[in-house]
């Protein structure tokens, strides 16, 4: 009888061997991609053989004046369409906007062109006509998928459409702690409180502006402390491993609050004009990086861990962290 079992045993061992070496699911992510500047970073990202790419905002630079005329934004999208590499069309793409693809620098709920801007955004990213984003105000959404037994829940926030007006001038914004001041707005908060309850092993939360950073002079969640406190409480109460992705800053960094990590990946091709990387923050883990960069996340279902890294334009490692999936 033994000869009959040996082939089956051999095939079983081969199967187990292949399973143990299953490739992690790879997600690259980044922000701040100017259509008028060369984009050499794409060839580097292609070498990582990613499964998906997340655009975290400022995916074009098409600011118009506050009148809501969108000629500049339309032209920016048209030019960017010819700049994005063809291989991206073979990957899963997830995108949110920030101010420069919203249409107004640091713009919020009062921007007159926001409805038409949303239509331009959805059409550019080829969002299917039956997608809820065509019927709602704002571009927030969620998406679920499973890789190697890990249930991943992607939650994408809109930090522009409903956001209250900023208090103060550019680079001198003041804290807005009014009870009614908001970033997400009532409808989006209600939606978030529902979808975040979905069964998942890993939550990836996309926000165009930084959630954890507090020290710099630019836009951030901490300008609206009540909103930030509400978000951190929501995340803190989760039993699910949660990672926050953000952009906007034209510099990159990794932050940690309790058990929550935030990775800011910015910029893909428009790095900070302020070359110093000396920015500090109580939640910042490493020195910030001010040249072109992108983020890379590896979801390893075999070992139940997530590895996320910041990489430079040549694909060299800047910083990396690894966390276990609960």
Please describe what each predicted stretch is.
Residues 14-17:
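N-terminal signal peptide c-region/cleavage motif recognized by signal peptidases
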Residues 1-8:
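Bacterial N-terminal signal peptides that target proteins for export
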Residues 21-326:
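Metal-dependent phosphoester/phosphodiester hydrolase catalytic core
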């Amino acid at each position: 009888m033994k000869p009959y079992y040996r082939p089956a045993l051999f095939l079983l061992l081969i199967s187990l061997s292949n399973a143990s070496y299953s490739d992690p699911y790879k997600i690259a992510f980044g922000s701040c991609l100017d259509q008028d500047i060369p984009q050499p970073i794409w060839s580097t990202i292609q070498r990582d053989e990613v499964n998906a790419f997340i655009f975290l905002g400022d995916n074009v630079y098409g600011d118009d004046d506050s009148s809501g005329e969108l000629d500049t934004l339309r032209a920016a999208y048209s030019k960017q369409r010819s700049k994005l590499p063809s291989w991206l069309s073979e990957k899963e793409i997830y995108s949110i906007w920030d101010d420069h693809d919203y249409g107004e620098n640091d713009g919020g709920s009062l921007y007159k062109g926001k409805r038409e801007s949303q239509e331009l955004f959805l059409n550019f990213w080829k969002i299917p006509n039956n997608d809820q984003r065509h019927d709602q105000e704002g571009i927030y959404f969620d998406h679920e998928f499973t890789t190697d037994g890990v249930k991943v829940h992607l939650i994408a926030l809109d930090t522009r459409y409903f956001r209250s007006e900023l208090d103060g001038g550019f680079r001198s914004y003041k804290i807005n702690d009014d009870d009614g001041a908001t970033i997400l707005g009532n409808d989006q908060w209600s939606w978030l409180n529902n979808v975040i309850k979905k069964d998942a092993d890993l939550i990836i939360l996309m926000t165009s502006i930084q959630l954890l950073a507090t020290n710099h002079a630019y836009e951030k969640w901490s300008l609206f402390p009540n909103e930030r406190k509400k978000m951190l409480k929501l995340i803190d109460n989760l039993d699910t491993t949660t990672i926050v992705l953000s952009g906007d800053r034209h510099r990159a960094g990794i932050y940690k609050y309790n058990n929550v990590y935030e990775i800011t990946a910015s910029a893909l091709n428009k790095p900070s004009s302020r070359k110093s990387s000396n920015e500090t923050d109580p939640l910042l883990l490493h020195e910030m990086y001010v040249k072109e960069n992108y983020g890379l996340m590896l979801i390893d279902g075999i070992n139940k861990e997530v590895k996320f890294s910041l990489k430079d334009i040549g694909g060299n490692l800047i910083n990396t962290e690894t966390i276990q999936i609960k």
